[in-house]
Structures are given as structure tokens and as C-alpha cells.
């Protein structure tokens, strides 16, 4: 059987948990569990932002201690700051590339962030992935 911390993490890992998932999370979070272990697991699995958002949305962040709340909140807002910076950089890059009439395709994180997560604090990105046809590569490198 899974640990209570794992079950909480699983219940809180949906981007938009439905009513049934919310009720399950409420039931689990009201039980006794290792708060430090829960937060460590969330950080390790890359879902600290989701855990923070969903516990806050349900109004149950108070079940965690002050240090755990601060840690989750810090991860969420750090991811948001980093992602906003990357989005700003991407906008500048695409404006320059667009002036050169070069077509690029966004890959991996940025499209997921915008189309799936719809919240810049849920998943920290570390880079911008672009796909460029080989014949356009010299033009992109010059810009």
C-alpha cells in the first residue's frame, strides 16, 4: 500500500482536479502524515507548484506547517518568475526571427506551459526549445 504522503501527492497532482479528486484530497490531508516528507516528495517529483496551488485552492494549506507552506510557496513563485523571464526572452527572440521571415516551431516546455498548465508557477522551465529547418539555421545563428 502507498504511503499517505504519496496518496496526497497523487490526489493533488491534477492540473484541474474535479470534485471527486478534491474530496479525496480533503479526506487525505485531514489525516496524520509527515509534512516534511510530503513537501520533499513534491519537490523531488517536480509537482511542488501543483501541490501548492491545489492545497491553496481548497483552502487547506493550513494543514501544513509554516516552513512547509513557505517552501511550497517559494517553489511556486520561483517557477513563475523564471517562466515569465523565459516567456519574455522568447517573445524578443521570436520578434527578431519573425523580421527575418524564418519559421520556427516551439517544442516541449513552453507549449505545455501555455496550453496545458495555463499557470506559470506550476512547472519550472529551464530553457527554450526551438526547431528550425536546416536551411534557416544560418539565419537564426546570425540573429
Where in the sequence are the language-model features?
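Helical scaffold of the NTase/Pol beta-like nucleotidyltransferase catalytic core
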Residues: 2-6, 17-108
Amino acid at each position: 500500500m502507498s504511503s499517505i504522503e504519496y496518496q496526497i501527492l497523487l490526489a493533488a497532482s491534477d492540473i484541474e482536479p474535479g470534485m471527486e479528486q478534491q474530496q479525496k484530497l480533503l479526506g487525505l490531508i485531514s489525516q496524520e502524515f509527515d509534512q516534511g516528507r510530503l513537501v520533499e516528495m513534491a519537490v523531488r517529483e517536480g509537482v511542488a507548484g501543483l501541490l501548492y496551488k491545489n492545497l491553496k485552492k481548497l483552502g487547506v494549506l493550513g494543514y501544513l506547517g509554516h516552513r512547509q507552506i513557505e517552501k511550497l510557496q517559494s517553489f511556486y513563485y520561483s517557477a513563475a518568475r523564471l517562466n515569465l523571464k523565459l516567456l519574455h526572452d522568447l517573445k524578443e527572440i521570436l520578434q527578431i526571427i519573425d523580421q527575418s521571415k524564418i519559421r520556427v516551431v516551439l517544442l516541449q516546455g513552453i507549449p505545455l506551459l501555455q496550453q496545458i498548465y495555463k499557470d506559470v508557477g506550476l512547472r519550472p522551465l529551464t530553457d527554450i526549445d526551438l526547431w528550425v529547418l536546416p536551411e534557416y539555421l544560418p539565419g537564426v545563428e546570425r540573429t
